Amino acid sequence: MPKSGGECVENAIDDSLRRDKNNLKNFMERFDEKQFERVAEMIAGNRTHGKKLFITGEGRSGTVGMRMAASLTSLGFSAQFVAAAEWVHGELGHLAPGDCVLMISHSGKNATMMHLLDVFKKREVVTMGMCGLKESPLLTETDAAIFIPSDEELLHCVPTRSVISQEAAVNAIMSQICAICNLREEDFRRNHPANDLIKPENP
């Protein structure tokens, strides 16, 4: 007997959550901890030396980058997100030698990002890459890089599992940075005087 519409919807929800869980499980089995440590150390060192950090990307990778920049800013870092397409329209003026740019791309072969990698090198900035393609120049030609494995996307094309992997990677980097810089809750709250942060409820 064919499944009802309600059953199909419920199965889709359960299937999606199961796939998300498996995606993170596979991510943890394949990630390289030393890559994460290297990027976190470079971002922390960038702050120590008074340099700026820029995060860039396109599409959903850009959205992940925006969240990372906002979170780092809340912790007192000079971090700014710049959409990949905007660099060649004047945003390059932000850069000074020694600044860092973290480039995020799931495919690792975006034409805009490939062009920017050459541009950033000529500007003598430190480049870091995050992508899901091991052969990508974002992993092989940057000063530091993180491979972000992910499972099959929704409908084989909608960014879903790749976004979960990227967000997990960002959380791991942020956690390592907090440990390196000995950051505490008060450091975050100092930049949130509105005191509107929500504390998790007890289960």
State the predicted function of each range.
Residues 1-2, 13-19, 93-94, 147-152:
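Short amphipathic alpha-helical segments, especially helix-boundary/capping motifs
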Residues 2-49:
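An N-terminal, well-structured beta->alpha segment
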Residues 22, 26-33, 48, 77, ...:
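Generic secondary-structure signature for well-ordered alpha-helical cores
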Residues 44, 52-181:
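Glycine-rich phosphate-binding loops that contact phosphosugars or nucleotide phosphates
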Residues 48-58, 196-203:
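Glycine-rich phosphate/diphosphate-binding loops and the adjacent beta-loop-alpha structural elements
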Residues 137-140, 179-203:
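Internal, active-site/partner-interface "lid" segment
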